[in-house]
């Protein structure tokens, strides 16, 4: 069994102001995505300035934050937030939905593309390889917060999370680290290598949807579902898995469509 590193969720406190690691992970994810996007900017559109790229990253980040929070409210805990709407603003306590953030990003990309003469999938193909940076950082934030841990297990790398998070004090799968490895590292490598060569429009977006859906679906088998929801069906199906099914199907559909229509190869 591995010891859980006791990390204070507050990274820095200046008087009453507290800066949480969870929030810093979002900044790291956004900053890392911007740096990598700037490396590929000329391939995407040589006429774009760094300022326009910054605008794109800003609006997509807003989509992630707003969509992620609203998605969690709608998909995972609507009753609690209807009872106390101010909880929506307590983002440092966690409670973000990837699927909600993904919808927010799509809406932001659609809006930004129309204003800048770019198609929706042109932007999504450009952005998709950058997303795992934020996903990986977010999962590290979950780990530091000692939240979203896995089921009890006797594997050698099991961890006992702090009592405030897990009163049962059982050795558990560190499922946040599994998601970091799959959704952050593995997904980044797959998309970054795949998008290094010109691909048909929609192919990179399809690869993202397909592999994220597969990775998340797999990890959900060892991750404890949100207490207020539990399992949706059959004693094992979670809300996360339900939301991943359309992503997997959409990913397969986009890849098939990309390679079976008239080829229009463009750099991602």
Swiss-Prot record:
An annotated Gene Ontology molecular function: phosphatidylglycerol-prolipoprotein diacylglyceryl transferase activity
Bilayer topology term: Multi-pass membrane protein
Localization of this protein: Cell inner membrane
Entry similarity comment: Belongs to the Lgt family.
Residues that bind a 1,2-diacyl-sn-glycero-3-phospho-(1'-sn-glycerol): 139
This protein's name: Phosphatidylglycerol--prolipoprotein diacylglyceryl transferase
Protein function: Catalyzes the transfer of the diacylglyceryl group from phosphatidylglycerol to the sulfhydryl group of the N-terminal cysteine of a prolipoprotein, the first step in the formation of mature lipoproteins.
EC assignment: 2.5.1.145
Main location: membrane
Pfam assignment, any one: LGT
Residue pairs linked by disulfide bridges in the UniProt entry: none
Segments crossing the lipid bilayer: 10-30, 56-76, 92-112, 120-140, 174-194, 202-222, 236-256
Alphabetic keyword roster: Cell inner membrane, Cell membrane, Membrane, Transferase, Transmembrane, Transmembrane helix
GO cellular component labels: plasma membrane
Enzyme class: transferase
Pathway in which the depicted protein is active: Protein modification; lipoprotein biosynthesis (diacylglyceryl transfer)
Taxonomy, superkingdom: Bacteria
Biological process according to GO: lipoprotein biosynthetic process
């Amino acid at each position: 069994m591995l010891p859980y590193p006791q990390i204070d969720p507050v990274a820095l406190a200046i008087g009453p102001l507290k800066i949480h690691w969870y929030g810093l992970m979002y900044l790291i994810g956004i900053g890392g995505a911007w740096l990598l996007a700037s490396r590929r900017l000329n391939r995407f559109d040589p006429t774009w300035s760094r300022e326009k790229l910054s605008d794109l990253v800003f609006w997509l980040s807003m989509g992630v934050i707003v969509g992620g929070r609203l998605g969690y409210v709608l998909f995972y805990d609507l009753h609690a937030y209807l009872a106390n709407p101010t909880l929506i603003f307590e983002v440092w306590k966690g409670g973000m939905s990837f699927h909600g953030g993904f919808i927010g990003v799509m809406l932001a990309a659609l809006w930004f593309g129309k204003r800048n003469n770019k198609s929706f999938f042109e932007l999504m193909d450009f952005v998709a390889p950058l997303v795992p940076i934020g996903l990986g950082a977010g999962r590290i934030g979950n780990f530091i917060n000692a939240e979203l841990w896995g089921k009890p297990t006797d594997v050698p790398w099991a961890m006992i999370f702090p009592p405030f998070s897990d009163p049962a004090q059982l050795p558990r799968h560190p499922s946040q680290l599994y998601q970091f490895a799959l959704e952050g590292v593995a997904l980044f490598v797959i998309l970054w290598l795949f998008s290094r060569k010109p691909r048909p429009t929609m192919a990179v977006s399809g690869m993202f949807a397909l592999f994220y859906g597969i990775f998340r679906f797999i990890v959900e088998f060892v991750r404890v579902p949100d207490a207020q929801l539990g399992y949706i069906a059959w004693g094992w199906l979670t809300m996360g898995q339900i939301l991943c099914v359309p992503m997997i199907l959409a990913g397969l559909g986009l890849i098939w469509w990309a390679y079976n229509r008239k080829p229009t190869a463009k750099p991602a």
